[in-house]
Regions:
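N-terminal accessory segments
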Residues: 1-47, 76-79
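N-terminal glycine-rich flavin-associated loop
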Residues: 12, 24, 49-81, 99, ...
């Protein structure tokens, strides 16, 4: 078995942490930007706990427009972004990087549409399996 190879850390991004946080504060309220060790620790891994790495910053957008502005800023400044839903994934898809902005979609937790006839549900990224089950159980449906 080979070891996990993560992308190389961009030291210039690490050294600009305060500026990046300040710039992102033009998009988000300060309480929606996490940078202190104890604040970001819960985000150092998803349910796949074999690999742990604290991100540079965690951002908690509340609107689609904020997500768009964060992505535009990070793209223009060549800052890696790792999106994260509920953090329950087991495949490592939301593993943070030391030089990334972790884009927590935790505030996007609404069920948008339930189509019982076609057995289809449209949700925001942070809706849990249990929330879906609770939403459909009165119609005798169950979701994972």
């Amino acid at each position: 078995m080979t070891s996990l190879q993560m992308p190389k850390v961009d030291k210039s991004v690490l050294s600009n942490k305060d500026k990046i946080a300040s710039d992102l504060n033009k998009i988000l309220k300060s309480e929606n930007i996490l940078s202190h060790e104890d604040e970001i620790r819960p985000y150092e891994t998803d349910a796949l706990a074999a690999y742990k790495q604290k991100p540079l910053l965690v951002v908690l957008p509340e609107t689609v427009e904020q997500v768009s502005e964060i992505l535009q800023y990070c793209n223009e400044n060549k800052i890696k972004v790792v999106p994260r839903g509920a953090g329950t994934g087991l495949s490592g898809g939301a593993l943070p990087l030391a030089d990334c902005v972790l884009l927590s979609m935790g505030k996007f937790n609404k069920i948008l549409e339930i189509d019982y006839q076609n057995k289809c549900i449209v949700t925001q990224p942070c809706v849990t399996n249990l929330a879906i089950t609770h939403a459909v159980q009165d119609k005798k449906f169950y979701y994972a």
